[in-house]
């Protein structure tokens, strides 16, 4: 049974900058996970249902207009979860609308935590490294337009790989 995820990819040059930082702070998973904003967390789907998932995602993409994301500064989920992330200061509600659209039908999943759009920069590391990540990227800032999202499939050898892109409907 395949494991899939759905996410907004962070564009270059910021994707590589944030992934390289994540690697430098000691997060061994960084090279297996493209820099992203999660919409659907890792989800195991039944064999033979990928086509239905793709059809659903295409319909969801038609229901949401492109939007702008502005990333600035850092945040954390500690003490609940050992995660440090770059925060969204613009595009939060649009990410919520998009996540709601994709997490229906075959991708209706119960979330472990409430949805909070973010870009992870350090995960499951000792507190000193999480503190370092929080401080080092406190001044990080970028802005980009979101016109699509991606379906990712997990491969045990190569990690998460985008397999299909879904364009958001053009703004009226």
Language-model features: locations:
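Basic, often amphipathic N-terminal segments
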Residues: 1-68, 76, 91-148, 161-172
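Short strand-connecting beta-turns/loops that link adjacent beta-strands
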Residues: 79-80, 156
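Charge-rich, low-complexity N-terminal segments
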Residues: 81-89
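Short beta-strand segments and strand-loop junctions that repeat across beta-rich extracellular domains
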Residues: 147-157
């Amino acid at each position: 049974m395949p494991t899939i995820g759905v996410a907004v990819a962070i564009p270059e040059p910021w994707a590589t900058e944030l992934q390289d930082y994540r690697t430098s702070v000691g997060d061994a998973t960084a090279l297996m996970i493209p820099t992203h904003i999660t919409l659907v967390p890792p989800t195991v789907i039944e064999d033979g249902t990928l086509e239905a998932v793709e059809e659903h995602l295409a319909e969801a993409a038609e229901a949401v207009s492109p939007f702008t994301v502005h990333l600035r500064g850092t945040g954390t989920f500690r003490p609940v979860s050992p995660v440090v992330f770059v925060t969204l200061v613009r595009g939060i509600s649009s990410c919520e609308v998009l996540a709601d659209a994709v997490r229906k039908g075959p991708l209706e999943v119960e979330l472990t935590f409430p949805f909070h759009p973010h870009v992870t920069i350090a995960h499951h590391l000792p507190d000193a490294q999480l503190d370092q990540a929080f401080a080092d990227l406190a001044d990080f800032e970028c802005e980009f337009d979101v016109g699509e999202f991606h379906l990712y499939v997990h491969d045990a050898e190569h990690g998460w790989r985008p397999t299909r892109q879904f364009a958001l409907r053009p703004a009226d």
